[in-house]
């Protein structure tokens, strides 16, 4: 019986995206095992035989030593075509893994959450019982590492305040967009997907729930509005109305055809992806909140 043991590194969004190409991997192997820092993502996918947390080799060493097992530790970010922005991350992964895929309608597959994680189902129900059945989900920050605990001069802990976070990016534009969404859809609650150290916004509900809960909530969400971030991957193919705001990255490399994509205008963007050349010189002109809102109101997927 053929089997493979795949290591998937990187952040939450990248790991969720990998589930999109697991059907092709499952055609090649009878059993598919995954090692990941987000192993719960892969336990939630029916194409995975089992998944293990990274760094706990005792859990999968017998599988790795099996003569019928292929060890697959491939990194799509190092793929030459991807670095040169000549293909989607799907295609880069497939090329590195030696499999063929059809990327036209790929979306993440998390079809076993209800079976594997009953607590997530209960939490999703609690959220809907609290905010109601009419809601919109938003995310405007990529995941940042939590800041270190703060102390005063005497060593006493200082309560965290997200307004102290140093890198503000386009946070003020996010509040402006939220205000526009709230004005256009006054009967809908706005659920804000963010880490504790990321900004909070007025007229939103910031939840403290496992990320898989958002995949379940997306099934009933009226709309999702987000940047190129982990939420995009958690909801694509589940929520029928997703607007994704793109900065220097592009939907033809990281996105999904089922979504509405609005891209920043790059005055200069000559650098390859994930270059060892320091900060990008790209001058990114983000769309205005008003421009994004026009896309949010549209109903058809595509690039705007």
What are these regions (language model features)?
Residues 1-304:
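Catalytic machinery of carbohydrate-active enzymes
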């Amino acid at each position: 019986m053929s089997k493979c043991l795949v290591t998937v590194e990187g952040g939450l969004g990248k790991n969720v995206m990998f589930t999109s190409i697991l059907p092709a991997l499952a055609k090649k192997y009878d059993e598919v095992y995954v090692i990941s820092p987000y192993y719960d993502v892969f336990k939630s996918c029916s194409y995975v035989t089992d998944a293990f947390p990274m760094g706990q080799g005792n859990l999968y060493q017998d599988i790795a030593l099996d003569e019928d097992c292929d060890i697959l530790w491939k990194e799509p970010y190092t793929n030459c075509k991807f670095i040169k922005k000549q293909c989607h991350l799907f295609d880069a992964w497939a090329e590195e893994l030696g499999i063929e895929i059809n990327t036209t309608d790929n979306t993440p597959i998390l079809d076993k959450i209800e079976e594997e994680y009953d607590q997530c189902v209960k939490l999703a129900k609690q959220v809907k019982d609290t905010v109601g059945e009419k809601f919109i989900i938003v995310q405007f920050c990529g995941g940042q590492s939590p800041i270190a605990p703060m102390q005063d001069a005497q060593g006493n802990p200082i309560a965290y305040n997200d307004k102290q976070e140093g890198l503000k990016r386009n946070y003020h534009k996010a509040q402006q967009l939220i205000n526009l969404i709230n004005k256009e859809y006054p009967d809908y609650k706005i659920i804000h997907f963010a880490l504790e150290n990321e900004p909070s916004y007025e007229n939103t509900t910031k939840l403290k729930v496992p990320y898989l809960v958002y995949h379940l909530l997306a099934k009933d969400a009226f709309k999702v509005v987000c940047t190129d971030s982990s939420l995009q991957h958690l909801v694509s193919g589940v929520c029928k109305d997703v607007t994704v705001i793109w900065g220097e990255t592009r939907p033809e490399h990281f996105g999904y055809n089922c979504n509405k994509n609005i891209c920043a205008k790059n005055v200069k963007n000559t650098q390859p992806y994930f270059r060892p050349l320091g900060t990008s010189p790209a001058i990114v002109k983000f769309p205005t909140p008003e421009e994004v809102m026009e896309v949010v109101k549209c109903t058809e997927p595509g690039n705007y």
